[in-house]
Amino acid sequence: MKPWHRALYGHWYPVARADQIGSRPQAVSLLDTHIALARTASGGWIALEDRCPHRHAPLSAGCVSADRLACPYHGWSFDAEGVLRQVPGLPEEGALPNVRVRAFAACQFDGLVWLRPGDAGADQPNALVRATDPATRRFQWHTCWPANVVDAMENFLDPMHTHFIHAGLVRRDARRVPATAHFQSTREGFTVDYAGGPSQSGLLYRLFESRRTAERAHFAAPGSTRLEYVYANGSRVLIDLHFTPRTVEATDVFVSLHVEGRWAPTWAVRLLVWPFLKRVNAQDVDMLRRQAENKRRFGQRRGASTELDIVTGALERFWTSGELAQGVQRRELQLML
């Protein structure tokens, strides 16, 4: 039995950076669905199940000619709809077998290739993704975390671990300040506004930021998350992480950094900011790996939670039931951040 709720297949997920997909097919996976992805000669996308129906060779090892994907074993070629168009060696008068490969809807937003693993569902990715201006993007990166998608997303959206896992870089446990978190559900997920903390106690804030007027966390189903920082000078920084589960224990993470209203050329971000962000990522990956190993060691047990775990319930609900909360939900809590 598949571990994923059927409703999850109707959503869109990023599977690759668009600048890294050309005419040479690549194998990608989401929700335990294996797909061959390539760019066609006309600039479109071809996304087919990574299995030729002839002798089950991987289509991702094949090649693209014009707008068709050819199998590496016997050359059977299929169009973007998965229809068989050619069998090399078959006489012209010979009839093509009535077979096809499962095809997947694909599109591009904010420099990423998005796929919908289900035959039906949403027409396009969520509004958070569609509203993002690619012209403000300063950095993009793809990695894979050794974690369940809920654990991975909670890690990014949860500020309470930063005093320990990222001690000194993001926050310091000895320099907590009172803050208020306002949780509100939305049509696509939820937002959490943090008030009372115009600055952070870590090195990253001191080096690269100025006084904040707003700090907000976003979740838009299925796997889009954002940390939004608004500054007193009118500028804004968006750190977007889009999560795509390959399997129950491995999650692709697509990172985009957007900067609005302040000087931040791409070269400066890569040279000055990226080394620190890479360190933060390594710290998170190390803890997520330890967490996953310990879950396997002790078996799946439900974790104890407090009101500080403000995002966990909504994430678990969506990924287990495929549903968001009904109606508008609001709650507020006090915390030492």
Question: PLM features: residue spans?
Answer:
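Rieske [2Fe-2S] iron-sulfur-binding domain
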Residues: 4-9, 14-137, 189, 257, ...
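C-terminal catalytic domain of Rieske-type non-heme iron oxygenases
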Residues: 44, 123-337
